Curated annotation (Swiss-Prot):
Enzyme class: hydrolase
Organism: Tityus stigmurus (Brazilian scorpion)
GO BP, sorted A to Z: proteolysis
Cofactor binding comment, as recorded: Binds 1 zinc ion per subunit.
GO cellular component: extracellular region
Record localization: Secreted
Residues annotated for Ca(2+) binding in this entry: D7
Family the entry assigns: Belongs to the venom metalloproteinase (M12B) family.
EC number(s) per entry: 3.4.24.-
Cofactors required: Zn(2+)
Record protein name field: Venom metalloproteinase
Keywords: Hydrolase, Metal-binding, Metalloprotease, Protease, Secreted, Toxin, Zinc
Length: 15
């Protein structure tokens, strides 16, 4: 995920 706030996977990447 690019890290979009809408994308929950962004939380794990930016985390």
């Amino acid at each position: 995920s690019p890290x979009i706030i809408i994308d929950y996977l962004c939380v794990t990447e930016t985390x």
